[in-house]
């Protein structure tokens, strides 16, 4: 991430054509967002949130307000500002647009689930529904949305839902999905990590719940690192 930021900081966006400048600001936001997810120090995390917000403002100043990309970045800005209800409203507006393709609609459902998670336990069920719908639509479109399945599994693990026993099944589907649709390097990495984690905990039946949580977290970290996560 530091290397990516150094490269971005070496570029003067004002010297780029407008379309490339938009891309520059979006890449900058993505890099900052990735860094905040890996950063435990609140001081540095806040610093990169501020940087992401600054680039969001720069992007919004260039994009037309009636474009779906404008609304997408605006929703992300609301999310960073912890204005979660506005973020939810904007994402729902995006989903109703005719120019939003089905696979993007599935991604927006996933983001919606993430925002609902920020609102606390009272919204956990709504978040679970959004993740589930996102996963279903994604599978219908024959595309991978592994994090949706993993989040569903993790939510089920930590709930008294009558379907909690399906948590490991969701995680299994996510891993197998990676094996089928991912490139060989990514698939092998996810699969070996997953089965290694299971193996070292196999004899600890009483720790089954904890095992699944570790598996979900480890696989999630690898997927984020490998670029599956955006929002």
Task: Identify the role of each PLM range.
Residues 1-205:
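A "functional boundary" signal
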Residues 201-231:
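Alpha-helical transmembrane signal-anchor helices
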